């Protein structure tokens, strides 16, 4: 019988590092400005976002090998996720329970529409709305560790439907791109309506 692997949790280690930095500051052995700067970084929201994405990738990437190989591959995947988001909001992990009522949001876009996959609507009172964390304009990067960047719309739908118990989403808030995409779709719909109208005339 295979041993169960504990999910990775780095929050305790980050807290311990902050505690050690406080001790070093009290000792007066090192310049306090540098220690305080490092402490601010470790306690920042950005560091928390990196930690969350790293932990989620570590727990879901399908990598065989030693813990060192797994950690190295996870670090590379985390850097790739943040590099891809440069100039945009940083990725966040949102976990939602999977219930009979669905997840409570709609998606649009996909490779076939030459656009990323986006959360186009969070249904008021639905699961996503009640749990918070997910908003209209979030780009969907992965579903339970499987990347949906550059994928067909249907693949994201299948992954969301196949999720059991709960679903972990990595998302990034980029509402301007969603607005541009919706404007493009509206132009296409208007052009189609004009063509249909002309063909009936």
Swiss-Prot record:
Cellular component per GO, a single term: synapse
Annotated motif Kinase interacting site, positions: 1-13
Pfam families per the UniProt record, alphabetical: L27 (PF02828), PDZ (PF00595)
InterPro entries on file: L27_C, L27_dom, L27_dom_sf, LIN7, MAM_complex_regulator, PDZ, PDZ_sf
Coiled-coil residue spans: none
Keywords: Cell junction, Cell membrane, Exocytosis, Membrane, Postsynaptic cell membrane, Protein transport, Synapse, Tight junction, Transport
Localization: Cell membrane; Basolateral cell membrane; Cell junction; Postsynaptic density membrane
A biological process term (GO) from this entry: synaptic vesicle transport
Bilayer topology annotation: Peripheral membrane protein
Main localization category: membrane
Domain PDZ: 93-175
Record text on subunit structure and interactions: Forms a complex with CASK and CASKIN1. Component of the brain-specific heterotrimeric complex (LIN-10-LIN-2-LIN-7 complex) composed of at least APBA1, CASK, and LIN7, which associates with the motor protein KIF17 to transport vesicles along microtubules. Forms a heterotrimeric complex composed of MMP5, LIN7B and PATJ; the N-terminal L27 domain of PALS1 interacts with the L27 domain of PATJ and the C-terminal L27 domain of PALS1 interacts with the L27 domain of LIN7B. Forms a heterotrimeric complex with DLG1 and CASK via their L27 domains.
Functional summary from the UniProt entry: Plays a role in establishing and maintaining the asymmetric distribution of channels and receptors at the plasma membrane of polarized cells. Forms membrane-associated multiprotein complexes that may regulate delivery and recycling of proteins to the correct membrane domains. The tripartite complex composed of LIN7 (LIN7A, LIN7B or LIN7C), CASK and APBA1 associates with the motor protein KIF17 to transport vesicles containing N-methyl-D-aspartate (NMDA) receptor subunit NR2B along microtubules.
Comment block on domains: The kinase interacting site is required for proper delivery of ERBB2 to the basolateral membrane.
Family indicated by similarity: Belongs to the lin-7 family.
Full protein name: Protein lin-7 homolog B
Organism: Bos taurus (Bovine)
Gene name for this UniProt entry: LIN7B
């Amino acid at each position: 019988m295979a041993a169960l692997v504990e999910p990775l949790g780095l929050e305790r280690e980050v807290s311990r590092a902050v505690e050690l930095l406080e001790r070093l500051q009290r000792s007066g052995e090192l310049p306090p400005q540098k220690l305080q700067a490092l402490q601010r970084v470790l306690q920042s929201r950005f560091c928390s976002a990196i930690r969350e994405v790293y932990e989620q990738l570590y727990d879901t990437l399908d990598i065989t090998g030693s813990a060192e190989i797994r950690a190295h591959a996870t670090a590379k995947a985390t850097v790739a996720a943040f590099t891809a988001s440069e100039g945009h909001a940083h990725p966040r992990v949102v976990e939602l329970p999977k219930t009979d009522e669905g997840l409570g949001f709609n998606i649009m876009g996909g490779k076939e529409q030459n656009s990323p996959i986006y959360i186009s609507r969070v249904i008021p009172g639905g699961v996503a709305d009640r749990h918070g964390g997910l908003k209209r304009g979030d780009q969907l990067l992965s579903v339970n560790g499987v990347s949906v960047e550059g994928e067909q719309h249907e693949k994201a739908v299948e992954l969301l439907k196949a999720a059991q118990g709960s679903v972990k989403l990595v998302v990034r808030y980029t509402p301007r791109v969603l607005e541009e995409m919706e404007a493009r779709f509206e132009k296409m719909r208007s052009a189609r309506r004009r063509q249909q109208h002309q063909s009936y005339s």
